[in-house]
C-alpha cells in the first residue's frame, strides 16, 4: 500500500510497488504474456467475490469469470477517464479520491457512492491513527519497504540520543555538575543510587522524546 | 462449455420472498410457473450486498492488488498522477461492480434455464451479456460484452435503432411495466445530455455486433 504519499503519487511507469496487504493469487489466464496479464485483475479474486452472492448450488463458468475480468478493466478505464477529464477541466494534475467518487456518480453508479464514502472515511481514519500512534507507526514502518532505510537512519540517531541521555541521567543522579566525566570515575556511588537513577530515567526519557521530535 | 465444479459453502441468506411479488418472465406467458430455485435477486438485495462492501472493517487488505489497478488506470495516457486513495477506492468499487453484475446475471441464469434447455445453475457469459444489455448504466461495456438482442432494455427512450422490436412496440410491451421491479430507470435529471449521448452510444453498440 502506498500510505506514505497521501497527497501525490509519482510512481514511475516501470516501477512495481510492494503491496503486502494485497492477497496474492494465481492467475488462470491462459495467455502467459506479462502485459496481457496486467490488463486484468486476478481471475481468482474475481471468482471469489462472485461466489459470495450465489446460492450454494450456483456455479460459474470460466468464460463468465473471464468476461467479468474484462468488464472490471473496462470499468476502471471508464471511471479513470472521467476523473481525468474533470481534473483537466479544473487545471489539476492529480486524481484524488473525491474525483473517483464524482466520476462514479456521474457515470450512473449512484448505488455505489454511499458505501464508497463510508469506506473512504474509515480508510482516512485509519491513516490518521497510524500517524499519531507510535505502535502502529512501527507496524507501518515494517510494512513500508521504501521508507525502511530512512527510518533505520532516524532510529539509529534516536538510539544514540538515548545513550547520551542515559549517561546524563547517571551524572545527574550523583548531583555532579559536569556531565562529561566518565562513568567509571565514581563506581560505588553509582551502584548505591541505582534505584533513584531508574526512577529519574522516566522523566528524562520523556524529555528525550521531546528532544528527538525537535531533531 | 467448461464449468466451475467447485461448490460454494457460503449459502446466501434467503430474502423475505413472502413480502416480494414473484418476478415476472421476460416473455409474456400466464400463469407464472412455480419456482424450484431461490428467487432471483431483487434490487433491495442487490443494494444490501453493495452496502456491505462499504461496511468492511478491514481497510488494510484490499480485494485486488493496487499495483495492477494503477497500471490499468495509467494505461490512459492522459492520466499522470493519482493519490493513494484513488486505487483503494477503485478496488472497493470493483468489488461492488462484480457483486452487481453477478446478481443481475444470476437472474438470467435462473430465468434462462426455464425458457430453454440451458442449465439453470451455471452462470455463463450469455447471462452476463443479457444483464449488461438490459441496464443503461452498463452501456460502456458494449465493446466488451456483446448485446443480447433477445433482452428488452429498461430504457425505451434510449432504445437503439435496428433493434428487433421497434421503439413504439417496446414502450407498449406489457412486460415492460413489470421490469420496474428489477431495476429503477436512471434519473434523467442527472444527465442533461442523456438523449443525445444515449442515442450515439446505442448506435455505436448496434453497429458493433461482431464484438468478442
Swiss-Prot record, chain A:
Subunit structure: Heterotrimeric transcription factor composed of three components, NF-YA, NF-YB and NF-YC. NF-YB and NF-YC must interact and dimerize for NF-YA association and DNA binding. Binds directly with DPB3-1.
InterPro entries in alphabetical order: CBFA_NFYB_domain, Histone-fold, Transc_fact_NFYB/HAP3, Transcrpt_fac_NFYB/HAP3_CS
Tissue: Expressed in flowers and green siliques.
Main location as per UniProt: nucleus
GO cellular component: CCAAT-binding factor complex
Gene3D superfamilies cross-referenced by the UniProt entry: Histone, subunit A
PROSITE patterns reported for this sequence: NFYB_HAP3
Keywords: Activator, DNA-binding, Nucleus, Transcription, Transcription regulation
Protein localization: Nucleus
Protein induction: Repressed by heat and dehydration stress.
Function: Component of the NF-Y/HAP transcription factor complex. The NF-Y complex stimulates the transcription of various genes by recognizing and binding to a CCAAT motif in promoters.
Protein name: Nuclear transcription factor Y subunit B-7
Superkingdom as given in the UniProt entry: Eukaryota
Family: Belongs to the NFYB/HAP3 subunit family.
Biased composition annotated in UniProt, kind: Low complexity: 136-151
Keyword DNA-binding in annotation: yes
Species the sequence originates in: Arabidopsis thaliana (Mouse-ear cress)
Region (Subunit association domain (SAD)): 68-79
Disordered as annotated region, ranges: 1-40, 130-151
GO molecular function, one term: DNA-binding transcription activator activity, RNA polymerase II-specific
Any Gene Ontology biological process: response to water deprivation
DNA-binding region location: 41-47
UniProtKB/Swiss-Prot annotation, chain B:
Keyword Transcription regulation carried by entry: yes
Location(s) in or outside the cell: Nucleus
The entry's keywords: Activator, DNA-binding, Nucleus, Transcription, Transcription regulation
Region called Disordered, residue ranges: 1-23, 190-212
Biased composition (Polar residues): 1-10
InterPro entries: CBFA_NFYB_domain (IPR003958), Histone-fold (IPR009072), Transcr_DNA_Rep_Reg (IPR050568)
Coarse class of the protein's main subcellular location: nucleus
Tissue specificity comment: Expressed in flowers.
Keyword Transcription regulation: yes
GO CC annotation terms, alphabetical: nucleus
GO molecular function: DNA binding; DNA-binding transcription factor activity; protein heterodimerization activity
CDD domains recorded: HFD_NFYC-like
Subunit structure: Heterotrimeric transcription factor composed of three components, NF-YA, NF-YB and NF-YC. NF-YB and NF-YC must interact and dimerize for NF-YA association and DNA binding.
Physiological role: Stimulates the transcription of various genes by recognizing and binding to a CCAAT motif in promoters.
Family listed: Belongs to the NFYC/HAP5 subunit family.
Name the UniProt record assigns to this protein: Nuclear transcription factor Y subunit C-7
Protein encoded by which gene: NFYC7
Amino acid at each position: 500500500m502506498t500510505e506514505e504519499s497521501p497527497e501525490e503519487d509519482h510512481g514511475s511507469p516501470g516501477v512495481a510497488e510492494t503491496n503486502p496487504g494485497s492477497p496474492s493469487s494465481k492467475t488462470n489466464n491462459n495467455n502467459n504474456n506479462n502485459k496481457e496479464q496486467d490488463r486484468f485483475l486476478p481471475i481468482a479474486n474475481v471468482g471469489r467475490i462472485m461466489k459470495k452472492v450465489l446460492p450454494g448450488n450456483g456455479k460459474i463458468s470460466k468464460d463468465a469469470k473471464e468476461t467479468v475480468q474484462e468488464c472490471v478493466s473496462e470499468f476502471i478505464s471508464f471511471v479513470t477517464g472521467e476523473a481525468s477529464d474533470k481534473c483537466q477541466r479544473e487545471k489539476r494534475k492529480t486524481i484524488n479520491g473525491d474525483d473517483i467518487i464524482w466520476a462514479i456518480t456521474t457515470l450512473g453508479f449512484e448505488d455505489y457512492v454511499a458505501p464508497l464514502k463510508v469506506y473512504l472515511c474509515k480508510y482516512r481514519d485509519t491513516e490518521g491513527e497510524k500517524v499519531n500512534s507510535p505502535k502502529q507507526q512501527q507496524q507501518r514502518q515494517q510494512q513500508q519497504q521504501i521508507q525502511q532505510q530512512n527510518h533505520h537512519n532516524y532510529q539509529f540517531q534516536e538510539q544514540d540520543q538515548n545513550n547520551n541521555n542515559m549517561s546524563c541521567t547517571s551524572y545527574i543522579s550523583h548531583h555532579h555538575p559536569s556531565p562529561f566525566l566518565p562513568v567509571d570515575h565514581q563506581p560505588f556511588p553509582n551502584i548505591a543510587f541505582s534505584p533513584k537513577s531508574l526512577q529519574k530515567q522516566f522523566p528524562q526519557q520523556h524529555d528525550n522524546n521531546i528532544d528527538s521530535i525537535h531533531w | 462449455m467448461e464449468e466451475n465444479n467447485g461448490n460454494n459453502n457460503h449459502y446466501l441468506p434467503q430474502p423475505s420472498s413472502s413480502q416480494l411479488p414473484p418476478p415476472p418472465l421476460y416473455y409474456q406467458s400466464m400463469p407464472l410457473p412455480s419456482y424450484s430455485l431461490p428467487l432471483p435477486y431483487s434490487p433491495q438485495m442487490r443494494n444490501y450486498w453493495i452496502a456491505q462492501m462499504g461496511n468492511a472493517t478491514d481497510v488494510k487488505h484490499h480485494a485486488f492488488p493496487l499495483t495492477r489497478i494503477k497500471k490499468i488506470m495509467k494505461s490512459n495516457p492522459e492520466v499522470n498522477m493519482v493519490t493513494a486513495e484513488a486505487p483503494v477506492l477503485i478496488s472497493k468499487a470493483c468489488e461492488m461492480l462484480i457483486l452487481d453484475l453477478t446478481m443481475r446475471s444470476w437472474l438470467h441464469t435462473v430465468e434462462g434455464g426455464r425458457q430453454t434447455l440451458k442449465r439453470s445453475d451455471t452462470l455463463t457469459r450469455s447471462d452476463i451479456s443479457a444483464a449488461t444489455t438490459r441496464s443503461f448504466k452498463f452501456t460502456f461495456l458494449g465493446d466488451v460484452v456483446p448485446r443480447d438482442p433477445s433482452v428488452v432494455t429498461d430504457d425505451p427512450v434510449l432504445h437503439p435503432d435496428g433493434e428487433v422490436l421497434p421503439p413504439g412496440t417496446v414502450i407498449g410491451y406489457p412486460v415492460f411495466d413489470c421490469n420496474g421491479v428489477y431495476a429503477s430507470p436512471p434519473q434523467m435529471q442527472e444527465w442533461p445530455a442523456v438523449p443525445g449521448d444515449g442515442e450515439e452510444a446505442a448506435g455505436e453498440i448496434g453497429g458493433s455486433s461482431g464484438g468478442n
